[in-house]
Swiss-Prot record:
Similarity section: Belongs to the nuclear hormone receptor family. NR1 subfamily.
Domain notes from UniProt: The 9aaTAD motif is a transactivation domain present in a large number of yeast and animal transcription factors.
Keywords: Activator, Biological rhythms, Cytoplasm, DNA-binding, Metal-binding, Nucleus, Phosphoprotein, Receptor, Transcription, Transcription regulation, Zinc, Zinc-finger
Recorded name of the encoding gene: pparg
Organism for this UniProt entry: Xenopus laevis (African clawed frog)
Subcellular location: Nucleus; Cytoplasm
Phylogenetic lineage: Eukaryota, Metazoa, Chordata, Craniata, Vertebrata
Occurrences of domain NR LBD (ranges): 252-475
Annotated spans, Disordered: 231-281
Protein's name in the database: Peroxisome proliferator-activated receptor gamma
Length: 477
């Protein structure tokens, strides 16, 4: 939980935004957590190759709003999660849709070398070329080699490319290789988009399922940015030391563009780190968490097939998934030094949070550790939208009544996620496996969160949580 002496939390928007596992860079401790019954690691294929040669889900617009009833078994209170219109984007008035949704075919299919037709290793000397043709062209140019003339116009392909060097070099020039266009490694974005646009229709004809998965990914992205007022793209950058001012307690406030002539309107209250007593602010945190639950519920009902599930299963999925989603999205507002608060207008340093009295000093540290590892994956909102949907549709949650339809939906989401990551991050071959590992890490973070919350509940006499949150925490891990 949070320190009862920290008013800033009232401003924190919680509604923001097997393969070779030894390749995972995160050295996480093993946890005794039940395995995912719907995650099939065997579907992940290795993306490493030997060095070559010389070296539809449709959006249900007719869905009616649903109130998800939580039976709190309380005599005087029965809470419900009611869907409310999402708040408009706070930090941006322009949608920032990922490039993955602009002419985006199944880009993980190998791009051919423009010279010999072998698999291209990258964008070299102005064209997509394999390692062999790249090295051949480089040596020819650097050493100023002159080959014996050939008038046969030899056909250059993978098996014959070493037979006639003259025709091979002429083919390099014909396809546009030039020393003036030298570029190694990743292809430029403009060239990538042009190439994807050229082969998009062909890929969809060869693999109609990929088109359905792209439609699903686009639908989830649109629902994501609509449901959550503060996404990763909308969040402001972390303080750079110039656009903010910092007090002696480790709290930073961004300068406001218009403060009403120097007034304190819109100012963010600063936290207090004194060791003594203070008024509890947990009710304010409860309000923020309830807002996050509403936003997550709004997004969940836009996942194709979710509203057709048993109502009790919908509630169970939301109950177990809400905090995993909150901590996933909170990572977008965190770095190794601190966390953005007050809808991005303030910054709370990590050192300040660690200086609080126990047990509150231990509250945020696991979230920082997770956020640092999670942010290293460099996901964008189009990736996160599908990942959040996968978290919600986890078929191994305790108490589910009808698991099969949940697993079917998650299987489709996992296929869409794998395609999305291969498309949006073609240079990160292990990304899908790493992201699945983060689902396990999230469960451990939530488990520790609940355990610490129970400790605070015993030590803080004035702790009070909204009945909805009490029901969520009840029997949670």
């Amino acid at each position: 939980m949070v320190d009862t002496e920290m008013p800033f939390w009232s401003n924190l928007n919680f509604g923001m935004n097997s393969m070779d596992m030894s390749a995972l860079e995160d050295h996480c401790q093993p946890y005794d957590i039940k395995p995912f019954t719907t995650v099939d690691f065997s579907s992940i294929n290795s993306h490493y190759d030997d060095i070559l040669d010389e070296k539809t889900f449709l959006c249900r617009n007719d869905q009616s709003p649903i109130d998800y009833k939580y039976d709190l078994k309380l005599q005087e209170c029965q809470s419900s999660i009611k869907l409310e219109p999402p708040s408009p984007p706070y930090f941006s008035d322009k949608p920032q849709c990922s490039k993955a949704f602009e002419d985006t075919p199944n880009s993980f299919i190998a791009i051919e070398c423009r010279v010999c037709g072998d698999k291209a290793s990258g964008f070299h000397y102005g064209v997509h070329a394999c390692e062999g043709c790249k090295g051949f062209f480089r040596r020819t140019i650097r050493l100023k080699l002159i080959y014996e003339r050939c008038d046969l116009n030899c056909r250059i392909h993978k098996k014959s490319r070493n037979k006639c060097q003259f025709c091979r070099f002429q083919k390099c020039l014909a396809v546009g290789m030039s020393h003036n266009a030298i570029r190694f490694g990743r292809m430029p974005q403009a060239e990538k988009e042009k190439l994807l646009a050229e082969i998009s229709s062909d890929i969809d004809q060869l693999n109609p399922e990929s088109a359905d998965q792209r439609v699903l990914a686009k639908h989830l992205y649109d629902s994501y940015v609509k449901s959550f007022p503060l996404t990763k793209a909308k969040a402001p950058g972390h303080p750079d030391g110039q656009s903010h001012r910092q007090n002696s307690r480790g709290y930073t406030r961004h300068e406001l563009a218009d403060d009403g002539g120097g007034s304190d309107q819109g100012a963010v209250r600063e936290p207090r780190a004194e060791q003594g007593g203070g008024d509890s602010n947990l009710p304010a945190l409860s309000v923020a968490l309830r807002g996050g639950v509403r936003e997550i519920t709004e997004f969940a009902k836009n996942i194709p097939g979710f509203v057709s599930l048993d109502l009790n299963d919908q509630v169970t999925l939301l109950k177990y998934g809400v905090h995993e989603i909150i901590f996933t999205m909170l990572a977008s507002l965190m770095n190794k030094d601190g966390v953005l608060v007050a809808e991005g207008q303030g910054f709370m340093t990590r050192e300040f949070l660690k200086s609080l009295r126990k047990p509150f000093s231990d509250f945020m540290e696991p979230k920082f550790e997770f956020a640092i590892r999670f942010n290293s994956l460099e996901l964008d909102d189009s990736d996160l939208a599908i990942f959040v949907a996968v978290i919600i549709l986890s078929g191994d949650r305790p108490g589910l009544l009808n698991v099969k339809p949940i697993e079917d939906i998650q299987d489709s989401l996992l296929q869409a996620l794998e395609l999305q990551l291969k498309l949006n991050h073609p240079d990160s071959a292990q990304l899908f496996a790493k992201l699945l590992q983060k689902m396990t890490d999230l469960r451990q973070v939530v488990t520790e969160h609940v355990q610490l919350l129970q400790l605070i509940k015993k030590t803080e006499a004035d702790m009070c949580l909204h009945p909805l949150l009490q029901e969520i925490y009840k029997d949670l891990y």
